[in-house]
From Swiss-Prot:
GO terms for biological process: cellular detoxification of fluoride; fluoride transmembrane transport. Na(+) is not transported, but it plays an essential structural role and its presence is essential for fluoride channel function. The keyword Transmembrane applies. The lineage of its organism: Bacteria, Pseudomonadati, Pseudomonadota, Gammaproteobacteria, Enterobacterales. It catalyses: fluoride(in) = fluoride(out). Na(+) binds at G75, T78. This is Fluoride-specific ion channel FluC. It comes from Escherichia coli (strain K12). The gene is fluC. Disruption phenotype: Mutants show increased sensitivity to fluoride. Knockout mutant displays pH-dependent hypersensitivity to fluoride ions. Deletion of pagP (crcA), cspE and fluC (crcB) increases sensitivity to camphor and exacerbates the nucleoid morphology defects of the topoisomerase IV temperature-sensitive mutants. The chain crosses the membrane at residues 4-24, 35-55, 71-91, 103-123. Belongs to the fluoride channel Fluc/FEX (TC 1.A.43) family. GO terms for cellular component: plasma membrane. Fluoride-specific ion channel. Important for reducing fluoride concentration in the cell, thus reducing its toxicity. Required to counteract cytoplasmic fluoride accumulation driven by pH gradients across the bacterial inner membrane set up by mild acidification of the growth medium.
Amino acid sequence: MLQLLLAVFIGGGTGSVARWLLSMRFNPLHQAIPLGTLTANLIGAFIIGIGFAWFSRMTNIDPVWKVLITTGFCGGLTTFSTFSAEVVFLLQEGRFGWALLNVFVNLLGSFAMTALAFWLFSASTAH
């Protein structure tokens, strides 16, 4: 149990730092759409898609790796709370169209990236 907790801790910290770095780099590029959060969510969705595909095929992988990557890293990297706050800020500023676009791009993009990663990994490992 301690190993699992440590894996979540390390993965979550690493993912959070990666998200912060992406936000620092990409959020200033566009005032209406927080590109750092979008990038973090899309990358995280892609990584978790690969992870789930990989873990479903490789059943002998230590559970520590599973929680390090999915719950830890992807949980720290992706952020529904920041995304939600950014949408609320856009709404408060009266940017309703941008808020709606932000919701659709984040949600649909994340679903698409997870499905794409799962499909790509599954196709590349099919025998």
